């Protein structure tokens, strides 16, 4: 699968749906470039990716069985863990937070604030939380119209929460280790961390503070792992919507992508 290399500006001219990713196997984790979202879709259909995801899940299942048998401390478990880590490094990856990084270099000092996606990815890492969290996310999103589902939604969520989060679930996929990634639109005025925290509380999922760094990546899984995709996932917002977000951040003394204006201090402690 090949694609002519496009600049971020060229991508913007061709489509409103753009993704920053590295589509290669065993890719350099510091390199990332802008692509049309259609290229991502084609990538998920590649047999090698499905095979790689399958290998990771098979090894993960073996690990889970060992955990049930209380064999987590053994050498075999650690060997499986190393194999899984190596295989995960072979996966292509995407940026949930930016359409573009300066010089195609994935690091905080190369972030392009103008290319903020106004979305983030919630990582559901606890296996026992995956199914309920996905169900709650779709319910909160307004996906179910049956009377019983509506009543249940109104019972477990407040009217304000339903109004705020309706339509903000953009994408749900199974992760390589058979957990879940839920991509959400960040509500106006919220930062990445605030949006993740608020959403996790509502869907009863454990919040992962390590998942809020601006330059974080998400490993890409195959087409069969995709559960739900909204039409505006990785879609560049119109000028009016962008202006509303930026004004809300400005009133809080934040940069146009919700980061502190003095980002140098934040960079030093953030993971790469």
Summary of predicted features, one role per range:
Residues 10-11, 19-22, 38, 103-132, ...:
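DNA replication initiation modules
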Residues 125-164:
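Short amphipathic alpha-helix segments
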Residues 164-191, 217-221:
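Histidine-centered divalent-metal-coordination microenvironment in nucleic-acid enzymes
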Residues 46, 75, 143-144, 162, ...:
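Short aromatic/hydrophobic-glycine micro-motifs
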Residues 72, 175, 255:
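Acidic surface patches and DE-rich sequence motifs
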Residues 93-102, 160-163, 196-200:
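A short linear-motif detector with a strong N-terminal bias
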Residues 1-118, 128, 139, 150-151, ...:
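DNA replication initiation on ssDNA origins
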Residues 106-111, 150, 156-176, 205-209:
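Catalytic micro-motifs at enzyme active sites that drive phosphoryl/nucleotidyl and oxygen chemistry
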């Amino acid at each position: 699968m090949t694609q002519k290399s496009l600049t971020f500006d060229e991508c913007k001219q061709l489509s409103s749906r753009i993704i920053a990713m590295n589509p290669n196997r065993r890719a350099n984790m510091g390199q990332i470039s802008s692509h049309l979202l259609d290229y991502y879709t084609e990538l998920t259909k590649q047999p090698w990716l499905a095979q790689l995801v399958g290998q990771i899940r098979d090894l993960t299942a073996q690990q889970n069985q060992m955990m049930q048998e209380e064999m987590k401390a053994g050498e075999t478990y650690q060997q499986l863990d190393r194999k899984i880590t190596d295989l995960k490094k072979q996966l292509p990856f995407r940026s949930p937070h930016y359409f573009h990084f300066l010089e195609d270099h994935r690091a905080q000092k190369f972030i392009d604030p103008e290319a903020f996606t106004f979305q983030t990815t919630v990582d559901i890492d606890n296996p026992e939380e995956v199914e309920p969290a996905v169900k709650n996310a779709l319910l909160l999103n307004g996906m179910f119209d049956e009377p019983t589902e509506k009543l249940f939604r109104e019972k477990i969520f407040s009217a304000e929460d339903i109004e705020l989060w309706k339509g903000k679930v953009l994408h749900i996929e199974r992760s390589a280790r058979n957990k879940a990634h839920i991509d959400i639109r960040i509500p106006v005025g919220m930062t990445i961390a605030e949006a993740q925290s608020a959403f996790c509380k509502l869907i009863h999922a454990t919040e992962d503070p390590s998942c809020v760094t601006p330059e974080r990546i998400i490993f890409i899984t195959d087409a069969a792992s995709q559960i739900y995709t909204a039409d505006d996932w990785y879609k560049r917002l119109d000028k009016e919507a962008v202006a509303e977000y930026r004004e809300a951040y400005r009133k809080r003394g934040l940069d146009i992508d919700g980061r502190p204006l003095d980002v140098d201090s934040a960079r030093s402690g953030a993971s790469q």
